[in-house]
């Protein structure tokens, strides 16, 4: 097997959770997660299910898949069905098309204006012929389903090269996190580490914003 990188890239914990939904990303997988919550504030987007969820604190994240316009409907429906089997409400999807004018083909395509589609293309680095899979939910559950979906879609599209080792460093872990069940704040990973920055200011800071001198090495998602 060969190394994907001569120098292992450094990825902050925050970036890893946004782009890969996990602090153990498999970088052999080229798919990236993007946050497109902002698009749903547009008046020319009428997908009301997501709009209502966003008002109650949910986010929208999506995965763009390259040149999947010729995939059969069953490819998309099977991924949506799979997401529901994981406990999610499913994955909404559409494909960018241009028959003289930009449009979106798929069950939810009609809810987006041409201008809104252009904004999504820009945010996701997508082109005509690419497809978008999107999910909406509270951050923790959203990260989980998009991370799983990223792996699932890559497997279905045969995007993973098994002959590569893709190492990376994950850095800048949060010192603390909030427990979803108790709503209390506790140590997120390793309590026996130093917080970053000037310690004299830490009492005044929101503990959830404090980063720790913690790091981890990841290879192929492990």
Region roles according to the model:
Residues 1-222:
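Class II aminoacyl-tRNA synthetase catalytic cores and aaRS-like
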């Amino acid at each position: 097997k060969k190394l994907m990188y001569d120098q292992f890239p450094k990825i902050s914990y925050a970036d890893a959770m946004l782009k890969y939904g996990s602090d153990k990303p498999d970088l052999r997988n080229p798919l990236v997660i993007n946050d497109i919550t902002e698009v749903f504030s547009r008046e020319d987007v009428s997908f009301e299910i997501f709009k209502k969820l966003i008002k109650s604190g949910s986010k929208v994240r999506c995965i763009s898949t390259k040149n999947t316009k010729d995939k059969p409907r069953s490819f998309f429906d099977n991924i949506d069905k799979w997401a529901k089997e994981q406990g999610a409400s499913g994955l909404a999807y559409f494909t960018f098309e241009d028959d003289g004018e930009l449009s979106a083909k798929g069950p939810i395509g009609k809810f987006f204006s041409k201008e809104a589609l252009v904004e999504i293309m820009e945010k996701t680095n997508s082109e005509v012929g690419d497809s978008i899979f999107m999910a909406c939910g509270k951050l923790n559950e959203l990260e989980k389903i998009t991370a799983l979906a990223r792996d699932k879609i890559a497997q279905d599209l045969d995007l993973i090269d098994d002959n590569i080792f893709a190492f990376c460093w994950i850095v800048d872990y949060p010192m603390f996190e909030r427990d979803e069940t108790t709503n209390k704040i506790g140590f997120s990973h390793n309590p026996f580490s130093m917080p970053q920055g000037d310690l004299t200011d830490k009492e005044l800071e929101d503990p959830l914003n404090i980063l720790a001198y913690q790091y981890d090495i990841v290879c192929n998602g492990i």
